[in-house]
């Protein structure tokens, strides 16, 4: 139909239209504040994301070709473990997935209660994020090989698996189309899943500049949210207008370049500039015995020396 063609084929009007809708939804959530906006919607969206993802994984794993994808995902190729490009890509993915280096964790961390055990909270956030990423792999990689079983091309000219926008907007839609009637429901559920994941990420990203404007410059939250939202939409529109040139470039520069470097600067600030005793007193408010535990014996040295050195070394090897 004309609607399905409009949704699946590349269209500038569609891209800018959905960008506007997406920014509008994000602005509505952020303008409502922390409790009525971020907390309320995150508590609704995250369980929905888990349920949808698990349901899709179960369905995809029952399809022909899924086991080949599962082997491709879970059986490691140790010959590539020292590849600088792979390490930089993995580091970029980790920084992007955890929203490190962009202020999100700092802002969200400032909203939790003072009596929270920060090392435990940090570990739980990392565990949850890694679990979601692992589940996403259990869905996407088997789905790619199910698509191959249906006659869809899944390898690029270079011999690597198709990834990025081409995977989402070409390979997977072709898979859903090949599934017949079931593909309509699976495809709809998959893109709802993608939208939920994107919204939960975008609200955390937008909260950073909004929080700064509200706290540092005393700007009204509603005004700050709409103003910054308009700036984000303008940048998004510029990327849509020059999609082939800018999209991959922006992804590479932000996740593989800017975020690791910014995270290294955060490590330097936390390890060398910020008073160690101030950090310890903050940690003690949630865990009075933290000073005598393994965390405090390792963390200061790790952040001060190892993290910046490893990030810089890995970053340098990527060139």
Where are these regions (language model features)?
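Hydrophobic alpha-helical segments and their helix-loop junctions in multi-pass secondary transporters
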Residues: 1, 50-74, 146, 239, ...
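A generic transmembrane alpha-helix motif of multi-pass inner-membrane proteins
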Residues: 245-270, 292-319
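Loop-to-transmembrane helix boundary motifs in multi-pass membrane proteins
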Residues: 16, 128-134, 184-187, 196-199, ...
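Membrane-embedded translocation segments of transport machinery
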Residues: 39, 43-199, 223-224
